[in-house]
Amino acid sequence: MTQEVLERSIQVGGRTMTFQTGKIGKQAGGAIFCRYGDTVVSAFATGSAQPREGIDFFPLTVEFEERLYAAGKIPGGFIKREGRPSEKAILSARLIDRPIRPLFPEGYRNDVQVVAQVMSVDQDCASDITGINAASAALTISNVPFEGPVAAVTVGLIGDEFIINPTVEQSEKSVMHLTVAGTKDAVMMVEAGAQEVPEAQMLEAIMFGHREIQRIAEFIENYRLEALERNLAKPKQEVVMKQMPEEIVQAVKAFAYDKMDQAVRTEEKKAREEAIRQVKEEALAHFAEQYPEDLKTIDKILEDFVHKIVRRLITVEHIRPDGRALDEIRPISVEVGILPRTHGTGLFTRGQTQVLTVATLGAVGDEQILDGLGLEESKRYMHHYNFPPYSVGETRPMRGPGRREIGHGALAERALLPVIPNENDFPYTIRLVSEVLESNGSSSMASVCGSTLSLMDAGVPVKSPVAGIAMGLISEENHIAILSDIQGMEDHDGDMDFKVAGTSQGVTALQMDIKIKGVSREILERALTQAKEGRLFILDKMLSVIEKPRPELSPFAPRIITASIHPDKIREVIGPGGKTIKKIIDETGVKIDIEDDGRVFISAVDGEAGENALKIIQALTQEVEVGRIYNGRVTRIMDFGAFVEVIPGVLGLSGKEGLVHISQLAHGRVEKVEDVVKLGDEILVKATGIDKQGRLNLSRKEALPNPNPNPNGSTANKNPRNS
């Protein structure tokens, strides 16, 4: 049996990206085997034949499956198979979801599932970027009514040069890691981390990436056309949208539209929600007898009214639901140090959004070890974001962080990363936890502000303070409104959620999600400019409360002492089976971390305990210097000489000792060792050498003045002064 296979390639960032269909996953709606360098991601897109009844959302799910065989690894643990998705897999799934979600027909209610499976990993060719392009191609050739294709690239910046899909080596030099996704016509999604890059340069990077995206998207579209000719792509499913009965729409409009308009204009969130609920209840009760079978339809009509009213108020009347101007930021309240025993706290309140961020400082050994498909590495700065149901007045089970919480935590972490001091300057592991106590939009950016406050309160010497703001967009016919500091309703009924974080000098993080078919350069430029104005305003509010990091750490934070030993001496500190280092820890109550290069980090809440541990380590690793005179203690007496300890032992461990041969005990002849020294005596000795077996030779004679300095036994000066 001969199978038809279509394989085509395109050059992206100086490497070949190959798309293949017809060989694998032929029962899926669309299947693509995508290879970029040596990274291979297989993407499968499948949609249900019928819409799901009784829902008012699009049931799209995206799974990003990491297989450890892709990196030549076997999973650890007892079960030896992959378990829950890693944080990286969750973020990659979100990265695929966000640009494709807006490109399905409005009102489409069929289940759609996209699965991206990582089968081989080349560290220089990112699996998430490969996954977006593969998923887009799979949807494009499937029967699912996808209005793509989209494509994605990463943009780096080294010097003044933009780089498409930088390698690992290039990424280390780059001051920007920008992921852009879009169609041929517009940008759909932006995700970035940067080292205070100016807004103008960030905009140029986005447009630079989009030019490459246009080329890839056109390639995928041509690939679909060729696949259709070969019967390897499926005709698109016809979408039949259920129309609202015009009679009911007009009846509900006549009864409820003006009332809903007044309800939406209520400025306070809870009062507004209650007013909208009352209008809905009143309308449903009014039409219950006339249209008993259409109450769900009526509820949907009322929701559409809210959506349209909000958009019209903002774009035509320039009135926001809470009465603010389009570029106005909600009232801000800032507090620090509100928890007594934590290392640092920041309470940031903006309108009805409130976040408490707590900073905890730990030892080097507290860093997170990352062991996935990428290179094995560790993370010494972490940010965790929690969004409990009470923050929006709801109840639901609390079963650990969801995808949204992981995504928001990663965004806030990325925003602060460029200003975190390096390990040499501040050898601490830093964990931030943001607790959303109240939310009416923009809680992730409030977490960024709270993070800066808590770090400064903890005494972490951040390079610059960082603030964040969420921008919105509503585009209605010929009217465009860009909103600063969007609240929940504006996010829900708007077209864009554009989060921007940074310092006074530039951008450190970006994230843009949209619900329309893309945004233009002009809109991006306006949003970035307006975001900078808002960010600087917020920074001023924060700095009026805490201007710079505290000069001292919290008394409850550990003190870290750093030292350096020769790498060959590491085994002496650790000891056989770790016995020595365990003894030091038990004796002093400190934490000790030793790097392979000989750096030692001693972490102790009690500074004196840390100093004691340092003295022990110094004693264990101290080298005897040949030619130096030591005050030693006689530990053993033999017929041929005495053993003298020149560096005392610690923790019951032996110190460093050497042999003073009987001939080296004194300047004259010695008949018996005990005639000169006794056990326990403290004597001056000179280190004279170390033999090939590592044994130390000492001399008491050379440490003492010679009573007969000349060969004739005279004590006269060898060079008597001339008379």
From Swiss-Prot:
Its cofactor is Mg(2+). GO terms for cellular component: cytosol. The keyword Transferase applies. InterPro entries: ExoRNase_PH_dom1, ExoRNase_PH_dom2, ExoRNase_PH_dom2_sf, KH_dom, KH_dom_type_1, KH_dom_type_1_sf, NA-bd_OB-fold, PNPase. The keyword Nucleus does not apply. Belongs to the polyribonucleotide nucleotidyltransferase family. This is Polyribonucleotide nucleotidyltransferase. Residues 558-617 form the KH domain. SUPFAM superfamilies: Eukaryotic type KH-domain (KH-domain type I), Nucleic acid-binding proteins, Ribonuclease PH domain 2-like, Ribosomal protein S5 domain 2-like. Residues 711-723 have a biased composition (Polar residues). Keywords: Cytoplasm, Magnesium, Metal-binding, Nucleotidyltransferase, RNA-binding, Transferase. Mg(2+) binds at residues 491, 497. Disulfide bonds: none annotated. GO terms for molecular function: 3'-5'-RNA exonuclease activity; magnesium ion binding; polyribonucleotide nucleotidyltransferase activity; RNA binding. Involved in mRNA degradation. Catalyzes the phosphorolysis of single-stranded polyribonucleotides processively in the 3'- to 5'-direction. Residues 627-701 form the S1 motif domain. PROSITE patterns: KH_TYPE_1, S1. Its main location: cytoplasm. Its EC number is 2.7.7.8. CDD domains: KH-I_PNPase (cd02393), RNase_PH_PNPase_1 (cd11363), RNase_PH_PNPase_2 (cd11364), S1_PNPase (cd04472). GO terms for biological process: mRNA catabolic process; RNA processing.
